[in-house]
Amino acid sequence: FISGVEIAATAFANIIEDKPVRPINTGVYVVFVLLWGTGLGIICRMVPVLVSASWVAGLSVLYFVSSVLQFKFLHLWYPIVIPLVLQAPLSFLGSTGIKYAWLFKEFLVKQRMEEDLTSGGDLQESMMPGECPVIEGYQIAAKSTQAREVGGDFYDFIEASEDKLGLVIGDVTGKSVSGALVMSASRSVFRMLSEGDLSVANIMIQANKRLKKDIRSGMFVALLFAMLDIKKKILTLCSAGQTQPIHYVAETGETLLVETEGDSFPLGILDDADDQDTNIQFKPGDKIIFYTDGIVEAMNAKEEMFGFERLMEIMEHAGEMDPESLLNEIVNSVNAFAGNVAQHDDLTIIVLGVST
């Protein structure tokens, strides 16, 4: 079937130039119309309304002019009006298709992130000690609460020898699978280095060198490592950017922030760290807490931080509580202070007490 316009055009061309007009292939034309409408829909979805309206108007004019020029110089004929009439519904379909394609892509990305977080959370949980070590003459309590599916905090107990116990508490910058892998690497490094005769400071120095090579740029570990001489009741510790421990001295009833020696930069930042040992001589009834910054930086609805002062006030009554009770008192106080406000950092604490 050939329309009257095409017949007239063909006859006119035959008479004037002896070059008949060629109708475009139906399949090609249908594909063109679909691509035309879909393309306009994509443009409408990707650019602002005023810009997309200008694009549609401009492309419509361009299409009309190109059709006339093709008819004149190439003798190629196809309906001009149909794409212009169908461009609105086809644009809507194209725009809707792009919208749902983006939504599906976002769904896949979110699903992958959730799977990564689940894997990271499982990995992190597997690294936490199942229970605190039982040592004659001492009491130990520990707890870690994640603010998200995958936290950045971790702690560990290392049986370096029959007479020595290592304690590690750290906070990794990345709270994802990569962060969990850094935790695993940190844990392995300290366990391995603790098997030798290195001092606490030298263990920290060697750990920093190894982690600096292994972890990617921009990630680091704020960590405190301590070694307890069980018989001598001496705790030797070294801090790399971790919060200051608090020591309750039973003999005087004082509560002291422990000042550590050295640079105290987190592991993975400096190539050569200048770490130094800090020694504490325990006496019966003494207690010391190690904790991450999620404790003191916990926020309430007024955007106030829990802070060191509140923590020190609790520690002033440490003599009245065993390590487990002291830990629960601190955690409950932080939770009561924060209320229903979602926290963005993990809460991790270790309490070490010397029996009377």
Predicted regions and their residues:
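Transmembrane alpha-helices and their extracellular/periplasmic helix-loop junctions
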Residues: 1, 13-111
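Active-site His/Glu-centered metal-binding helix of metallohydrolases
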Residues: 12, 173, 295
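… and, occasionally, acidic/histidine-rich disordered N-termini of signaling adaptors
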Residues: 109-289, 339-356
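Hydrophobic alpha-helical scaffolding
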Residues: 2-5, 110-113, 320
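Hydrophobic alpha-helix feature that most strongly marks membrane-spanning transmembrane helices
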Residues: 17-20, 36, 48, 66, ...
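C-terminal catalytic subdomain
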Residues: 278-290, 295-356
